[in-house]
């Protein structure tokens, strides 16, 4: 076999290996590491390894008009441009939101979001650092919002007007640990978010049909964004305590990509 064919074969093997490894991404934070995160705005990691999305005072109380975002340091592929197929994903995290003096009128909440790579923070308040205007077709964002102003779980797509919502009385459980699971089934285009307050096992869920390919770029950043109220009685903390994430293209999609690469060299 000639040297050029050997080189081509070696390149093909590298590409096939990369194609298969790129089909799946997973990580797990039981304690957060700043080296594995992109921190924006007021977001920080505490000495205990907790992700603090908004600023807190020395005594742990929230500060007003604070906004922070935190994303996994590496981009995640959500769509394969070769096959047009989408990845499914599953993410689990725990968080707590504690209002100032246990006030029941705190704002504005926290969101799990898929945003464009290299995205910068946007407006505060109920925009949650994700949007600059109420409706923005060019935002390329899908978010699951835990809206403490309206006491509901929302699914947002390029807009602060939700495509799905479900009531959730956040202020009934001030400061308690919340466990969240969000799944996306790419074959059914189904996005589901479920929330459980661990102490009372009180559960809420919201589901919507989401065509990710119509909203998101092929590669995204995944993570969190939060904003706090404009004065003390409406301020609140937004702490993420743990986070795991996994995404995967179907085996059929991986095979299609491998066949495409093979055909390039035949």
Curated annotation (Swiss-Prot):
Record keywords, A-Z = Glycoprotein, Lectin, Plant defense, Seed storage protein, Signal, Storage protein, Toxin
Gene3D superfamilies found in the cross-reference section? 2.60.120.200
| Residues annotated as glycosylated | 28, 92
Q: Which InterPro entries match?
A: ConA-like_dom_sf (IPR013320), L-lectin (IPR016363), Lectin_LegA_CS (IPR000985), Lectin_legB_Mn/Ca_BS (IPR019825), Legume_lectin_dom (IPR001220), Leguminous_Lectin (IPR050258)
Entry's Gene Ontology BP terms: defense response
| Signal sequence coordinates | 1-21
Pfam families for the chain:
Lectin_legB
> Which GO terms of the molecular function aspect are on file?
carbohydrate binding; nutrient reservoir activity; toxin activity
Q: What does this protein do?
A: Seed storage. This carbohydrate-binding lectin has toxic effects on the important bean bruchid pests, Z.subfasciatus and A.obtectus.
**Family classification:** Belongs to the leguminous lectin family.
* Descriptive protein name: Arcelin-4
In its UniProt entry, the species of origin is given as Phaseolus vulgaris
The gene behind this protein is ARC4
């Amino acid at each position: 076999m000639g040297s050029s064919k050997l080189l081509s074969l070696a390149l093909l093997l590298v590409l096939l290996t990369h194609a298969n490894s790129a089909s799946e991404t997973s990580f797990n934070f039981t304690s957060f590491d700043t080296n594995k995160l992109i921190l924006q705005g007021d977001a920080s990691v505490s000495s205990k390894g907790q992700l603090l999305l908004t600023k807190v005072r020395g005594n742990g109380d929230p500060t007003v008009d604070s906004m922070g975002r935190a994303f996994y340091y590496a981009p995640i592929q959500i769509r394969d441009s070769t096959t047009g197929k989408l990845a499914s994903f599953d993410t689990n995290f725990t968080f707590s939101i504690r209002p100032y003096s246990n006030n029941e009128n705190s704002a504005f909440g926290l969101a799990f979001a898929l945003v464009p790579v290299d995205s910068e923070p946007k407006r505060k308040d109920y925009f949650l650092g994700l949007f600059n205007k109420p409706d923005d077709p060019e935002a390329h964002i899908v978010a699951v919002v835990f809206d403490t102003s309206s006491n509901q779980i929302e699914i947002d797509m390029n807009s602060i007007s939700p495509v799905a919502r479900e009531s959730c009385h956040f202020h009934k459980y001030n400061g308690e640990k919340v466990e969240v699971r969000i799944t996306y089934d790419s074959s059914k285009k189904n996005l589901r978010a479920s929330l459980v307050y661990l102490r009372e096992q009180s559960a809420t869920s919201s589901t919507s049909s989401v065509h990710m390919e119509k909203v998101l770029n092929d590669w995204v950043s995944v993570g969190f964004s939060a904003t706090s109220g404009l004065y003390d009685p409406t301020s609140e903390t937004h702490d993420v305590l743990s986070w795991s994430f996994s995404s995967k293209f179907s085996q059929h999609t991986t095979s299609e990509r491998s066949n495409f690469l093979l055909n390039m060299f035949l």
